Amino acid sequence: MKKSKLDNSSSQIRFGLVQFLLVVLLFYFLCMSFEIPFIFRTGSGSGSDDVSSSSFADALPRPMVVGGGSREANWVVGEEEEADPHRHFKDPGRVQLRLPERKMREFKSVSEIFVNESFFDNGGFSDEFSIFHKTAKHAISMGRKMWDGLDSGLIKPDKAPVKTRIEKCPDMVSVSESEFVNRSRILVLPCGLTLGSHITVVATPHWAHVEKDGDKTAMVSQFMMELQGLKAVDGEDPPRILHFNPRIKGDWSGRPVIEQNTCYRMQWGSGLRCDGRESSDDEEYVDGEVKCERWKRDDDDGGNNGDDFDESKKTWWLNRLMGRRKKMITHDWDYPFAEGKLFVLTLRAGMEGYHISVNGRHITSFPYRTGFVLEDATGLAVKGNIDVHSVYAASLPSTNPSFAPQKHLEMQRIWKAPSLPQKPVELFIGILSAGNHFAERMAVRKSWMQQKLVRSSKVVARFFVALHARKEVNVDLKKEAEYFGDIVIVPYMDHYDLVVLKTVAICEYGVNTVAAKYVMKCDDDTFVRVDAVIQEAEKVKGRESLYIGNINFNHKPLRTGKWAVTFEEWPEEYYPPYANGPGYILSYDVAKFIVDDFEQKRLRLFKMEDVSMGMWVEKFNETRPVAVVHSLKFCQFGCIEDYFTAHYQSPRQMICMWDKLQRLGKPQCCNMR
């Protein structure tokens, strides 16, 4: 009996021990099931995030709630937003689950929103048979083939040694009348100009002819002489480094005048107009010369015999008493150009600007503009109502500058993009760029992309580039994208009418890859004050959906001319309110609405991307109100005081503006003297 009891007791102990071990094992697996996600979650937030968070707080004048481990610490989402499928911001947990996908996209550097051209085949788009969609399908098809060849290595740079074509730099270039006409009235300056270079043009203006403007007629005689940057960028109109336009007859004032200016990407700068009055004493001189000399004017008071001439004599006596040396006008000079009368014009490159003399007399001086240098002036064009007899260029540079666009790339680690953060960012900036805009992208990297917010990855900026028609450009573009890590290639053949596809890709990246609170679009010739842009967005009360920029209201499409829009493309009389394309901001929910509509083939696509954005925001506004904020500081035409963005800035102007922002601590333009 005792033995039996002992056996029973020992068996019960063994059974209890097994149960205990099973409970411990179950508890162990239970702990591990909770521990593993915790380990991954804590491991995803590195110490660098904390450091960058403090630098972000230091960069802005007022605190901004970013970072932290809870949903409320990242985006404060109210109940109203919670119920709205388009409004809610992604919480960190969901974003972290997407991290592997995000990293893969980052390494690929290719937008995947346009899988292939068949995306436009399955219907759904209301205007699927339009010219736009046919153009898009063809561009995506060709782009995919080009990219597949690049990605697979089938398209490679030529391995055969290329004989470097060293262009000679002659000290002097001259052409006769017939040669000039045969060369399309352009004199090529192989190595540009240098200090002291001078060009002489011998020509005769035509007699005035009748031109009609509607019901009005006018007698017109004018010509244009331009220094052009012929080697700036292929496929674009060359920048006009100096535009010299004498109007003998036909100016709106009714008097002969001389207009001077510069033009970059079809955007004119601030002009200099000489109308016969000498520049005032308070205007700056150019190498000691006045900007505009005086000549006789056909005024009612008899030109120089009137009050103006008396005033000039008084000024001369006053300057003499004060010890200031300034010559007095002793001759009644005529306007330097006349119909049917031969002239000899000389253009000279000085220390501070260009100086133009006619028949040995100084006429005008034009100060250099920040965006251009003398070596950029590789062509002289003379067009209009004029016969050119000969052109001479002398004292030209002896060295040959490299005009290869790739020379602007500086393969240094300092210019590489920081890695993507592990949590949503405050602002994503998508920058539209063309494949061969190597200099523009490098200037952006060296200027406003060095801002503390960008370097700390609180703000992420990426270039969105379509494929170029030339394969060698695409090969260099792929290398650039792989090295710097800041280029997203949108795989279609670039076309001006398809820029809107890049805009959709920007929204998709901002929503799905970085989950940005705000999404901004700008161009590669736009200078952005990143901190000011965020502050402007944060001014919107509450957590409203927003659309911020330089808003156009009640604009009508142009039906004639170069930028004409057909009724098939846009049947409505007016465009919706839209922000100018060089710089605008969207809230996350608006960007997500655009991406969702595109993926579901409900998005109407129009060739003008800024108008398209206004149209999409208007549609979103039908279901949820959008705070539309208009500000002229998102400058469309050049640069203004206290700008948020400045458009049409050349690479040199971008570097200049960044230098001023760093040294002075405040924004200052670089396109005015």
From Swiss-Prot:
One of its GO terms (biological process) is arabinogalactan protein metabolic process. Pathway: Protein modification; protein glycosylation. It is an enzyme of class 2 (transferase). The chain crosses the membrane at residues 20-40. Residues 185-394 form the Galectin domain. One of its GO terms (molecular function) is carbohydrate binding. Its cofactor is Mn(2+). The keyword Glycoprotein applies. Expressed in stems, cauline leaves and siliques. Residues 1-19 are cytoplasmic. PROSITE patterns: GALECTIN. One of its GO terms (cellular component) is Golgi membrane. InterPro entries: ConA-like_dom_sf (IPR013320), Galectin_CRD (IPR001079), Glyco_trans_31 (IPR002659). Keywords: Glycoprotein, Glycosyltransferase, Golgi apparatus, Manganese, Membrane, Signal-anchor, Transferase, Transmembrane, Transmembrane helix. Belongs to the glycosyltransferase 31 family. Possesses hydroxyproline O-galactosyltransferase activity. Transfers galactose from UDP-galactose to hydroxyproline residues in the arabinogalactan proteins (AGPs). Is specific for AGPs containing non-contiguous peptidyl hydroxyproline residues. Utilizes UDP-galactose solely as sugar donor. The addition of galactose onto the peptidyl hydroxyproline residues in AGP core proteins represents the first committed step in arabinogalactan polysaccharide addition. AGP glycans play essential roles in both vegetative and reproductive plant growth. This is Hydroxyproline O-galactosyltransferase GALT4.
